[in-house]
């Protein structure tokens, strides 16, 4: 099976009340852990690559690793550009064989966001590629994305119809209170997503797939393990999983997860070196790290996304 677009995936997810996991990848072990979990659960999958990951892992290596995952698992897999910040980057990824790209012009004025998104959509259409766009701006730091809380903003539902109509985008990322990175909410506050915004967007765009970025839950057992074995992550808090599950049961068809993968891998490696300080063969610590990724993704697919058994 070749790489696929997310169009059919999202139609099924919207009608079925579940979401597809979009997991950020940047090396072999992360890709293997994610795809092994998805294969066992027969779950559809989006593997997404940021600008930073593409630079780190080399565009050719990363593409071939994803292609190997398709061959090995036989799963429907989307290769997606996460947070493309220019037409040129989106064009390059499309030419490299990506089946989905995101153009993130959410920090620009509304009219400029529309114009740049439309430019990407027109090019992508000619190549059979789908486009995700964004309205509203998430706070937080992750890879190339760095937005202060002061510069973040919720999506304005009254803008979504005009935006989708004028751009022709295939899915829309909205801001309802999630944020990038591992420090999403202040300690002592109750994390709460703006479901009123989501519901109003859904009312205005019936049947249209919505995307949530910054949706890692930052499991506290992983944070504790990182800190236990020499880390320093005080106050790391994520999005409650019950709220993500609720979003998946509504119009959210794609939920992005990155920080949780980083936590799982880092916690495993820190623990391994604390318990086995003499080890120096990378396979000795990367194998359990890969297993930690697999276990995390298994949990996400079954208990948060609800997309197990939905691959075919």
Regions found by a protein language model. Give the residues of each.
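Generic N-terminal amphipathic, Lys/Arg-enriched alpha-helix
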Residues: 5-21, 279-280
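Alpha/beta enzyme core
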Residues: 4-12, 27-53, 59-76, 84-209, ...
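C-terminal alpha-helical cap/extension of soluble enzyme domains
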Residues: 228-231, 239-312
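Long, repeat-rich segments with strong aromatic
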Residues: 212-218
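Basic/polar N-terminal segments that are highly enriched at the extreme N-terminus
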Residues: 1-3, 312
């Amino acid at each position: 099976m070749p790489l696929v677009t997310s169009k059919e995936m999202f139609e099924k997810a919207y009608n079925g009340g579940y979401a597809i996991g979009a997991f950020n990848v940047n090396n072999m072990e992360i890709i293997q852990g994610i795809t092994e979990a998805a294969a066992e659960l027969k779950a559809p999958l989006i593997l997404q690559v940021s600008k930073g990951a593409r630079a780190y892992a080399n565009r050719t290596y990363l593409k071939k690793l994803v292609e190997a995952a398709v061959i090995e698992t036989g799963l429907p897999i989307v290769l997606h550009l996460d947070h493309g910040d220019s037409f040129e980057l989106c064009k390059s990824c499309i030419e490299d064989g990506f089946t989905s790209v995101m153009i993130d012009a959410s920090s620009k004025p509304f009219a400029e966001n529309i114009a740049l998104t439309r430019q990407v959509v027109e090019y992508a259409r000619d190549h059979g590629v789908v486009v995700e766009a964004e309205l509203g701006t998430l706070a937080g730091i992750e890879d190339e994305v760095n937005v202060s809380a002061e510069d973040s903003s919720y999506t304005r539902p009254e803008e979504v119809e005009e935006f989708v109509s004028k751009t022709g985008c295939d899915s829309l990322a909205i801001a309802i209170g999630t944020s990038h990175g591992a420090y999403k909410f202040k300690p002592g506050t109750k994390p709460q997503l703006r479901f009123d915004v989501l519901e109003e967007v859904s009312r205005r765009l019936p049947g249209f797939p919505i995307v949530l970025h910054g949706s890692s839950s930052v499991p506290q057992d992983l944070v504790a393990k990182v800190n236990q074995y020499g880390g320093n992550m005080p106050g790391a808090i994520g999005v409650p999983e019950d709220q993500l599950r609720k979003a998946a049961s509504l119009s959210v068809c794609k939920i992005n997860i990155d920080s949780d993968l980083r936590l799982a891998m880092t916690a495993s490696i820190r623990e391994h070196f604390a318990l086995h300080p003499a080890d120096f063969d990378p396979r000795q610590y990367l194998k359990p790290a890969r297993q930690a990724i697999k276990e995390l993704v298994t949990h996400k697919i079954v208990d948060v996304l609800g997309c197990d058994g939905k691959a075919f």
